Amino acid sequence: MNKKLLMNFFIVSPLLLATTATDFTPVPLSSNQIIKTAKASTNDNIKDLLDWYSSGSDTFTNSEVLDNSLGSMRIKNTDGSISLIIFPSPYYSPAFTKGEKVDLNTKRTKKSQHTSEGTYIHFQISGVTNTEKLPTPIELPLKVKVHGKDSPLKYGPKFDKKQLAISTLDFEIRHQLTQIHGLYRSSDKTGGYWKITMNDGSTYQSDLSKKFEYNTEKPPINIDEIKTIEAEIN
């Protein structure tokens, strides 16, 4: 190899290597791009929360448990139809056995599915309880604050059931907050908490910035033993 060619090799080769390495090196996001991506993700999450909690729920009363297993339950309704209930957590199963009568608060997730056994309608669970009723309906003692200031209620959620699941209470409280107090409807009302205090001093609490975690579901509580329900939106 002559001197001129050798010199060109040593001069050009490092540049070629540098160019090749640059072609395969990912370009990091700028701080503005990272902020925009995080904001878009947050907005999608808030929209999902608003869609979920501002829409209505489905209620089944006096349904018969056909089978109950981890992650799902089949029930026979009073009109003879069969519904398949899908639990948000595959490890959750309420303590009811075949043949028992139950009330359910649910959210529809799929259209009807016709099978040889009957028509299945898929629902996502938001509470299973017994069918016991109260002599007179009870209004939940809900007190709401928005950014630290009282936000009065004309009326609170009212129930004639003796028991409610924590997940059902979560849905009903948040539904009220979205409809009356603007929860999830503006950028300054996307978080906070609700807290239930019972007469015996025990408490239940949920973070408003994310959906209720169904794997933390507790046994149903008697609503006539609720002392206070506080909700803070921020």
Swiss-Prot record:
InterPro entries: Enterotoxin (IPR008992), Staph/Strept_toxin_CS (IPR006126), SuperAg_toxin_C (IPR016091), Superantigen_bac (IPR013307), Toxin_b-grasp_Staph/Strep (IPR006123). Keywords: Secreted, Signal, Superantigen, Toxin, Virulence. It holds the Pfam family Stap_Strp_tox_C. GO terms for molecular function: toxin activity. Belongs to the staphylococcal/streptococcal toxin family. PROSITE patterns: STAPH_STREP_TOXIN_2. This is Toxic shock syndrome toxin-1. One of its GO terms (cellular component) is extracellular region. Residues 1-40 form the signal peptide. Responsible for the symptoms of toxic shock syndrome. It is found in: Secreted. SUPFAM superfamilies: Bacterial enterotoxins (SSF50203), Superantigen toxins, C-terminal domain (SSF54334).
